[in-house]
Amino acid sequence: GENQSSHYNKFYFVKILKIVEISYKSVRPSLSIFDLWADLLRRSAVSSNFGLIMEEISIDIFNLLDKQPEPARGNVLLAKPTVDDACFKRSVILLVDHDSEGSMGVIVNRLTDYTLADVIDGPDYFQEIPLYMGGPVGLNQMFFLHTLGPDVIPNCIQVARGLYFGGDYEAVKRYVACGEPVEGKMKFIVGYSGWEKGQLADEISRFDWVIQKHIDEALIMGDQEADDMWKAAVESFGEKYRTWNNWPTNPSDN
C-alpha cells in the first residue's frame, strides 16, 4: 500500500545517500554533505523512481572521472554499473579489433548453459568445457581466446601480451581432442560485440564504458561468475572506481 511504499522510499533514500556520498567524495572530495543532501532532496521532489534518480546521479559522478583514452585492440571495456541492457549489464569486454571503421570485442564473463560438446563432436570431456556468450552479433559463430600462441594455434591474432584470438580451427580441435589443458588457457565464445564507425566512441563519451589499457590475463581467462569478474575488474581500475561495487545490481527494482 501507500504507507509501505513510503517506508521503502525512505529506506532506499538513505541507502542511496550513503552510496552516492562515497561515490561523489571519491571524485570530488570538496563536496559538502549539505550540498549532497540538497541535490538528493531536489531530485526526489520530482521523482519517486529511485532507479531514475540513481541513473541521473551516476551521469554526474561518471562525468567527473578521468577522460578516457582512445580504444585500441587489447583494451578491456568495463560496463558502468547503471548499464541495464541484458547483454551488456556488468560486462567485461576484450577488444580484439579496432580501427577507424569500427570495433569488435568479446564479453569474457558471460557464461552460457552450453558446453563445447553442444557445438563440436568429440570425447565425453567436451561436456566439461564451457561456452561463453561474446555478444549479440554472430551467434551462429564460435570464436576462441587463448594463451597458446601461433606455435600451437597457427594464424591466430595477438591481441595483447600473451593473449591471442582465433587461429586455425583444425589445430584447436586437435589440441582439445588430445586432452590438453583448457582451463585458464582457452575460452570458447559464441557471438561477439560489434560497433560501427564512431559508435563505440559515442558510448565511451557517455561513460557507458571505461577503458583499461593494461589487461590482467589471469582475470580475462578466469572462470569467475559474471558479477565476481566484473567486481574484480572494477578493483583493478583503481580507487576512483571502487565505489561502483557498492552500486545495487538492480537499482530500478527499488
Task: State what each model feature region is.
Residues 55-189, 193-254:
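A short aromatic-anchored loop/beta-hairpin motif
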Residues 2-8:
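Short, charge-rich patches within N-terminal targeting peptides
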Residues 8-13, 24, 34, 50:
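Aromatic (phenylalanine/tyrosine) cluster motif
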Residues 3, 16-22:
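Polybasic, lysine-rich low-complexity intrinsically disordered segments
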